[in-house]
Amino acid sequence: MAVFFVNGTEVTVEKNQRLLRYLRDTLHLTSVKDGCSEGACGACTVLIDGEPIRACTPFTDSLAGRHVITVEGLTDEEKRLYTYAYGEAGAVQCGFCIPGMVLCTKALLDRNLNPTDDQIRYALRNNYCRCTGYVKIMDAVRLAAKCRREGVIPEASENDWKLGSSVHRIDVEEKVLGYGKYPDDWYLPDMCYGSAVRSQYPRARVLAIDTSKAEALPGVVRVITAADIPGENKVGHLKHDQYSLIPIGGLTHYLGDAIALVAAETPEILEKAKKLVKVTYEPLPAVHNPPEAWAENAPRVFDEEESNVQAYKHIARGDADTAIKNSKYVISQHFETPWTEHAFLEPECAVSYIDPDGYVMVLSTDQSSHTTLHECKLLLGSDKVRVQNQLVGGGFGGKEDMSVQHHAALITYLTGRTVKVKLTRPESLLIHPKRHPFWMDFTMGCDENGIIQGVKAKVYSDTGAFASLGGPVLERACTHAAGPYNYQNFEIEGTAYYTNNPPAGAFRGFGVTQT
């Protein structure tokens, strides 16, 4: 047990727990964001006796007599100051990191109203921002310092909103002060918690699923398998090849494949129940990269597909072979690019419930809410579904595909319960699509002056365990492979291959950055 102060109010905490969980789950101080739960990202930063501390690291028993401040506990003047400074500087984008940045700013300025750039950087060193590149955030800190030195906080007036003027984002205040809602910020009555039991192998046959021990655990609401799905099992952004749940007898496609869904009354019971679901597998050889995917007699990632080819593109103009043959100089080179993680700060989360009209309402962090709606309808076999997008804590293409929304909708549809389904950071890294890795062979010919005469290229992408946007990404990659130069002879062939890797899909640049 510990007695300490939160925003000036004395609290008594009986159960020793991470401060982050107490602030969010008990006090519902949702400005304290959960980005990683492992002390890495800084989104959960609070002030403890004036020092910025990541709330996911200390336990409550260590806080006896100490004073914790969250953004909700700032004075009204401080709230106006930081809302103005961050809004005026254009420092707010997705907003997920901003409350933590604000408290680091306050801690710095409480000690030093004339910070140098190096001091500002040091003050923000433990806080990640994926959106801004920090330049605007540093501008906001400088502006806040100036306002405090001069004792003046200008008012941002809607009367100044006119063509050619710089205006604040309309969502600045709710993001700076942390009261804007991301899905994980919803705490609804009678809410249970859901999560998926995922494959232990990238490619294996599921022989049996034993849910009996999990179902017998007190506090478990329901365990769901593919046999319980009322509609279509497969979803997908453009092609329906992503299994919502792998059925008995089915093939897993990567480590992120969901085998069963568990819903429980608390997150603690949920984790215990997931470990009690026993899945029997027949492990099979996996496909790790395009060269393995195109090899003769390669294992097929999908039983139902004739090959591992997901998409093929061919773009040509002029006569590249002749142009290269007649060139003074010819060079051939092989290139490879790796997969790249989007690294948005907000892990995927969805909250689902039955709304007053009897519809399944899904509160989603989503870059493709209309597609999510369509896919949830197919999964449930019902048109009585609604999707309401909440604030999105970064996406960059990585939240265009289905992640947890359909699982939340399915649990609510089958149980009638309100449910929150949220990925841990490791799950998020495993499951959502990445930037496509590419294997590329280019041949270029030029004349004696170095003027390009022709280009030929064969490019191969790893689209992973399902199509996502593999086709459009490949098309863009092939279209831009010839570069921005003015020449009339090129031929580009591109092939996207299924593998047993995490999926690849939309990412800023969309194929252009690879070729």
Q: What do these predicted regions represent?
A:
Residues 90, 165, 171-177, 238, ...:
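Glycine-rich loop/linker segments at domain edges
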Residues 83, 105-109, 142-143, 233-238, ...:
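Short acidic, glycine/serine/threonine-rich loops at helix termini
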